Amino acid sequence: MQEQYRPEEIESKVQLHWDEKRTFEVTEDESKEKYYCLSMLPYPSGRLHMGHVRNYTIGDVVARYQRMLGKNVLQPIGWDAFGLPAEGAAVKNNTAPAPWTYDNIAYMKNQLKTLGFGYDWSREIATCTPEYYRWEQKFFTELYKKGLVYKKTSAVNWCPNDQTVLANEQVIDGCCWRCDTKVERKEIPQWFIKITAYADELLRDLDKLDHWPDTVKTMQRNWIGRSEGVEITFDVKGYDNTLTVYTTRPDTFMGATYLAVAAGHPLAQKAAANNAELAAFIDECRNTKVAEAEMATMEKKGVDTGYKAIHPLTGEEIPVWAANFVLMEYGTGAVMAVPGHDQRDYEFASKYGLTIKPVILAADSSEPDLSEQALTEKGVLFNSGEFDGLAFEAAFNAIADKLAEKGVGERKVNYRLRDWGVSRQRYWGAPIPMVTLEDGTVLPTPEDQLPVILPEDVVMDGITSPIKADPEWAKTTVNGMPALRETDTFDTFMESSWYYARYTCPQYQEGMLDSKAANYWLPVDIYIGGIEHAIMHLLYFRFFHKLMRDAGMVTSDEPAKQLLCQGMVLADAFYYVGENGERNWVSPVDAIVERDEKGRIVKAKDAAGHELVYTGMSKMSKSKNNGIDPQVMVERYGADTVRLFMMFASPADMTLEWQESGVEGANRFIKRVWKLVYEHTAKGPVAALNVDALSEDQKALRRDVHKTIAKVTDDIGRRQTFNTAIAAIMELMNKLAKAPQEGEQDRALLQEALQAVVRMLNPFTPHVCFTLWQELGGEGDIDNAPWPVADEQAMVENTTLVVVQVNGKVRGKITVAVDATEEQVRERAGQEHLVAKYLDGVTVRKVIYVPGKLLNLVVG
């Protein structure tokens, strides 16, 4: 064994061994308990960042630990390879998205291997290959036949100059990111999958997910947004149709003083024909961003349509306004307004001088003061005719019943969740497998024409999708009739909604999934990824699993038993102000800092001498130039050090502060382990451990070893507090480094201890542990070695620490046998020189003994 720890030599050698031996390749094995450990698959952006490294290190630690428990562990990896960034990069680099993507995959795959992650590479998937997306296309056509897919017009961001649809993130301050033209809202036909058909089950089954974070479950509950209310129909004077609204507060119905409809509502459109102000307002609404978050904060505006609705219970005429806060795609495109008891309605009514009618009493049973704001709390009704005096629940039921009796209302459960729009007007995605015949009939692409392959050899102009620009691509025939293919592509959330299942059978050619393999491995035992995916990806992931279950492919109801959301990685951020007042962000690597005695940064400059402003720690990002390149760190310290720091610096679900001093600390610790193993093995062969022959000190050290095994096992396996597991191993290492190494049993005990330490560290630092295990004469490869088991006998405390007091003051501590009598404890206390001097020449008048804990001698 060489004396110096040289990670650059060890790591490449061990990685080559894993590759050649195919150590982490697995197949279904009914004789073994399975464990499926999955980290969210990366987008091949070009380089790994520290967020990736953290996510994948956590996954690898769990997978290697479970493997050492003797389980059949599947840990796959792949690439979420479609998406918008590839289109931008292709235009910028004058290439096509496909070669750019495949180059990135090759580069990042090498980076993952350099970090020593134990993946089954035989199952690698890239979602942009026809071998993958063909099954997604086929499944979509089956969902269409089941009635779970439909097409309808829906609002998108449209750039009139480029004649193209923009993603929300491509709209900057209401303008096109490319040509700065004012963006419009345009209604175009798009494909939807009926996730709302599964809303109740998606909500209900959250209760089965005991090992998912409550925050994620709450976010999904709110997103699905189940509510119980009443749907009410209003007649409108001079308008052919009725207006339908939904409310969760029918108790306030007698206070409804106006209705509001979306600018795109047929009633508003009709009224605009002879109302120029309304027509202009509708036009303005077309350019409003469609995101819900924007809706909440934007100024509420409206125009009176001139129509009057008839209140179904009072017969009063109430005005119908067109308002920018009502969206056509939400509910019926019309809402009932009760300004006395809803703050948004109140602000709108105050702005436009509309009637505000209170119908709920304040908590003290007085009439509410509505001079400043609405009273939104529930309470007792007044000003409501026959319903006066009823509290919320009774009023809800009485008014709902009355409306139903009159045939103008019905109770209804509503969901905030909307159907999933899967159409994207982009090129780099899987083509949607639908065709349109010349007579307008829409059909799914026949199975013998699947997959609909996306051409990869294209020229990008940065404006139009190549498959939209080429009229020939869309032409096809169905049953001998000419037809046109759909030129939209799937939302990339489609690919990431079922990849976890395809990993169980990536080479399967007979269908989307091989049920036998899928049901052996699924559900996923632990799924690791960022909390930013809480609603979109993790909801679609659950939805797709239920679709596959109902298609007979899987038997479980949910895709993953446990979800672990890792925290973000933060780093110092610095900038200097440029000549034009702009902020120039400087990488923390290039900042020369001065710190105070507490280690806080007080001053910083860069190599060019700019005074830097330190903004504290923030998430590593391109915008703040504070990302640390994992590759540089691996080259400087080795992959094991980077992995150990990542797992030690913070609990897995909390933010991690990147500190190079911490990385250096992790590196020093690995060197200490290496040094101790080197010194130990240099002394030659070791005798067998004879537990019965150990001295009290040796027994105490062995007790520490086995207590550490028990703690680390619990920390990794049950609590998943990986940082405390590492801390416990470090504490044990300090004791081992101080332990005597001369006697035969000293060395035998150290051999047992070091073999345990190396196995416990293996999930975190697998390269160095692979090597040290061999040096310590471990059997076979450490990758196949069992996890150390704590010896219950060794952990039994056969001695205990008793505190000795004289007249109530602590004068010493003594170690005695657990079963020592009071007499023996007194005798032992008298021999303790710190205690003995207080007993000299005095009489012990009383003895208070708490067995195994305290001896108090009262003297006089």
UniProtKB/Swiss-Prot annotation:
- A GO BP annotation: leucyl-tRNA aminoacylation
> Which EC number applies?
6.1.1.4
The subcellular location is: Cytoplasm
- Using the record, list the residue span of the signal peptide; answer none if the entry has no such feature: none
Q: Sorted alphabetically, which keywords does the UniProt record give? A: Aminoacyl-tRNA synthetase, ATP-binding, Cytoplasm, Ligase, Nucleotide-binding, Protein biosynthesis
> 'HIGH' region: where is this motif?
42-52
Return the GO cellular component terms, semicolon-separated: cytosol
- Which reactions is this enzyme annotated as catalysing? tRNA(Leu) + L-leucine + ATP = L-leucyl-tRNA(Leu) + AMP + diphosphate
- Molecular function via GO: aminoacyl-tRNA deacylase activity; ATP binding; leucine-tRNA ligase activity
The protein's name in its UniProt record: Leucine--tRNA ligase
Organism of origin = Salmonella choleraesuis (strain SC-B67)
> What's one Pfam family here?
tRNA-synt_1_2
**Location of the motif 'KMSKS' region:** 619-623
Q: Which family does the UniProt entry place this protein in?
A: Belongs to the class-I aminoacyl-tRNA synthetase family.
Q: Which domain of life is it from?
A: Bacteria
Q: Where does ATP bind?
A: 622
